[in-house]
Amino acid sequence: MGAFTKAAYFLLHPNQLRSIVQWKVWHEPVHRRDPSKETETEKACFRHLELTSRSFSAVIQELNPELLMPICLFYLVLRGLDTIEDDMTIDLAKKEPLLREFADLMEIDGWTFTENGPNEKDRELLVHFDDVIAELKKVKKPYYDIIREITVKMGNGMADYALNAEHNTNGVNTIEEYELYCHYVAGLVGEGLTRLFVESNLANPALLERMELTESMGQFLQKTNIIRDIHEDYVDKRRFWPKTIWSKYVNTWDDMFKPENREKALQCSSEMVLNALKHTEDCLFYMAGMRDQSVFNFVAIPQAMAIATLELVFRNPAIFERNVKITKGDACQLMMESTQNLRVVCEVFRRYARRIHKKNDPRDPNYLAISVQCGKIEQFIESIFPTQDPKKIALAQAQNSNQTAANTTDNGDTTFLVLSMIGVLFVMGGLMIGAAWLMGARFDMAYEDITARVGTLVNGAAAVSSATVSSIPTTVMHQEL
């Protein structure tokens, strides 16, 4: 977007510019990374982080210092693994062992990988992977063990999918396969992060006993991305929408993108959104377990972005024609709200759930189920943060009683004041009349004079009235029409 186009856009959408400016000016990170105290390999890791994901880089660099480097390295390790899996130029016979043995390779000092295709966007990370390995050697053993264990699980899962000819040819078939794929690429990430949070005492240990909450966090993010990226994946000959869902609406996958099937495609996307929305309550419950503000920000921002993205793609025909994403202004607004507390984040979810409900079409076969799910989200939020808090109601009633009593007191004071003023006037009037009488005033003569003057005025008015009546003719002649 050119400078002139941007200026015109912001003139027409001033609220977008306002949100961006507010975020830039008023956002104060909980923690700030200090590059002056970092080694060269640490600085290199953060450069790789910024090159692979600017959005995640920003929130990672504001984390509590205890988790700053472990989570940065965790992200880079999984990104390196993902870069190998996504590269279609690597032969399967070479790719499978790389994925399965990646956790062992990252223990070899100086190991790098230079065989990615030239167009693979994150190939530089693997070319300089020795920087990541050098820093992995320095992290605390409990953190390293968590990173390694998740890398083993994810590498094996990716290798299994790479060998799955049916998946590679026809994509995902069932909802179970769809959720298993989301587990390997996102659910495991959530598991690793939760264990890191708890190990550092920055999250409630009870989260380890409710791993379904962690799973929902990853599922919600990954499903949202899959729905949003449908056009991009179609162009790349990939299909992640389960056949169990899309086959209800069209005969072939290609039919989803034909203009004449647009309404059917929208109904299919509605069911996909419904499938993602079922994780929202777990996500909100999970966020309540964060004990550190920077960690809360880290988990809340992506979730708020996800619910906003679901609202954007819901019944939006543009997703079948191009890639869509929330505006930068909306993103800044969401980040401002998501870096406060759980109550504010719940309000974000409530707001977007209501927007989804408003966009819902009664002709859509998923209309009722989506309406119910939106209602469940509101009901869950209401159970955490009641809008009619009994304590607040009692306090308001007490304040109203005090105000009523104050008004009653005020009314009594006002009456007393008016009567006092009238009494003062009578007393002052009496004193003045008494003083005049003592000075020799003749009130009897004044009374007679006033009576005579009033009689004269009355008689004169009667005479004028009689003369006027006698001058009016008794008959009025009308001209011929």
UniProtKB/Swiss-Prot annotation:
Membrane-spanning parts: 294-314, 416-436
UniProt keyword annotation of Repeat present: no
UniProt xrefs under InterPro entries: Isoprenoid_synthase_dom_sf, Squ/phyt_synthse, Squal_synth-like, Squalene/phytoene_synthase_CS, Trans_IPPS_euk-type, Trans_IPPS_HH
Top EC category: transferase
A Gene Ontology cellular-component term: endoplasmic reticulum membrane
Keywords: Endoplasmic reticulum, Isoprene biosynthesis, Lipid biosynthesis, Lipid metabolism, Magnesium, Membrane, Multifunctional enzyme, NADP, Steroid biosynthesis, Steroid metabolism, Sterol biosynthesis, Sterol metabolism, Transferase, Transmembrane, Transmembrane helix
SUPFAM superfamilies: Terpenoid synthases
Protein origin, superkingdom: Eukaryota
Example GO BP: isoprenoid biosynthetic process
Catalytic activity: 2 (2E,6E)-farnesyl diphosphate + NADPH + H(+) = squalene + 2 diphosphate + NADP(+); 2 (2E,6E)-farnesyl diphosphate + NADH + H(+) = squalene + 2 diphosphate + NAD(+)
Pathway in which this enzyme or protein is active: Terpene metabolism; lanosterol biosynthesis; lanosterol from farnesyl diphosphate: step 1/3
EC number: 2.5.1.21
NCBIfam families tied to this protein: squal_synth
Localization annotation: Endoplasmic reticulum membrane
S-S bridge residues: none
Chief localization: endoplasmic reticulum
Function: Catalyzes the condensation of 2 two farnesyl pyrophosphate moieties to form squalene. It is the first committed enzyme of the sterol biosynthesis pathway. Required for the biosynthesis of ergosterol.
Family, similarity comment: Belongs to the phytoene/squalene synthase family.
A molecular-function term among this protein's GO annotations: squalene synthase [NAD(P)H] activity
Name assigned to this protein: Probable squalene synthase
Cofactor(s) recorded in Swiss-Prot or TrEMBL: Mg(2+)
Annotated Pfam families: SQS_PSY
PROSITE patterns cross-referenced by the UniProt entry: ER_TARGET (PS00014), SQUALEN_PHYTOEN_SYN_1 (PS01044), SQUALEN_PHYTOEN_SYN_2 (PS01045)
Membrane topology value: Multi-pass membrane protein
